[in-house]
Amino acid sequence: QDPISFWAVKTFPYNSEVGSVGVGDYESLERFIPKENMIAPQFKNKPDSVWDYHKYIGYDQYINPYGKAKDAKDFAMKAQLVNYDQYRALMEGFSNKMWDWYTGSIIWKTQNPWTALRGQMYDYYLDPNACLYGLRKGSEPLHIMMNPLDSMVTVVNNGLTDRNNLMVQAKVYDMAGKD
């Protein structure tokens, strides 16, 4: 999903089934995809039959800004960047409207009961992927975030302690890492 959609679209005020993508890291993929099928999916093309069998849903439009995947290992690494961003943005979108619209959310399907290629924060072998860390970052007790719709920077206090007199200092980088 486009991370901006988590900010722009209101869902149910208490949403008990939220989630996004979740391809595992390369080590996870090696455990169940035969070597001859370790082919990076190509945007808008039907994926390899093994990837299809394991329910891969294409999201290359979010991976390609990091550069077209050269191989399955490169794809898995870039997928982790997208996984992190998806779940961080998911929680930030909820936090942005918490108590104004939202009252809570629960992640649906944190893992898969089989070797699947979507909707998981940790795989069948209990190996976490970047979704888990993005979720944790977006849900941290004191979190600084930028609304991609209006560029407003907000500090969200998800903790139990009041926080006062805080200052945010931010620096912006482009996709090449230049400020």
Task: Please report, for each region that a protein language model flagged, where it lies by residue.
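Substrate-binding clefts and catalytic carboxylate motifs of secreted carbohydrate-active enzymes
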Residues: 2-164
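Intrinsically disordered, low-complexity Pro/Gly/Ser/Thr-rich segments with frequent PxxP/GP/PP motifs
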Residues: 164-179
